[in-house]
Curated annotation (Swiss-Prot):
CDD domains: protease_HslV
Cellular component, GO annotation: HslUV protease complex; proteasome core complex
Superkingdom of the source species: Bacteria
Protein name: ATP-dependent protease subunit HslV
Activity control: Allosterically activated by HslU binding.
Quaternary assembly: A double ring-shaped homohexamer of HslV is capped on each side by a ring-shaped HslU homohexamer. The assembly of the HslU/HslV complex is dependent on binding of ATP.
Predominant location category: cytoplasm
GO function terms (MF aspect): metal ion binding; threonine-type endopeptidase activity
Family to which the UniProt record says this protein belongs: Belongs to the peptidase T1B family. HslV subfamily.
Record localization: Cytoplasm
InterPro entries on file: ATP-dep_Prtase_HsIV_su, Ntn_hydrolases_N, Proteasome_sua/b, Proteasome_suB-type
Catalysed reactions, semicolon-separated: ATP-dependent cleavage of peptide bonds with broad specificity
Main enzyme class: hydrolase
Amino acid sequence: MTTIVSVRRNNKVVIAGDGQVSLGNTVMKGNARKVRRLYNNQVLAGFAGGTADAFTLFERFESKLQMHQGHLTKAAVELAKDWRSDRALRKLEALLAVADETASLIITGNGDVVQPENDLIAIGSGGAYAQAAATALLENTDLDAREIAEKALNIAGDICVFTNHHHTVEELESTVELPKPTA
């Protein structure tokens, strides 16, 4: 599988992922690009799961973004509806992490759309390790979103055999002032 992590801090959002593609217990490729920019570079997306399945979902999600003029939540909900109702899509095994300048979402294979706590997303085989690392870094450091995502991926790559240290990182800067999280 893989590890994808998304962190939002100080008006920046990052989605980062490793590059490992595995077939069973064999590494087939180490430099796959599992994080992309979509919709005129205004949306970031990363996938964990089957590569062919993820490309299908990227295409579907991008068409939903076009249909809804880049509105992230509407596009995600419409994709999730299709994912639930379309027999071919229901067989796809992948998770998507998506973000724009105002929201971060997880779109799951069973058609759920989840807005994570603290705008932190970590999915894939190393997701739990990356989430733990990113949470600790968010709570105890002043590192920026990119540094946190990269460090979390490195920690996941040290622990998870299906995650490597070849990273793709995409970053958006928000022009919208977001409310500060409350304790």
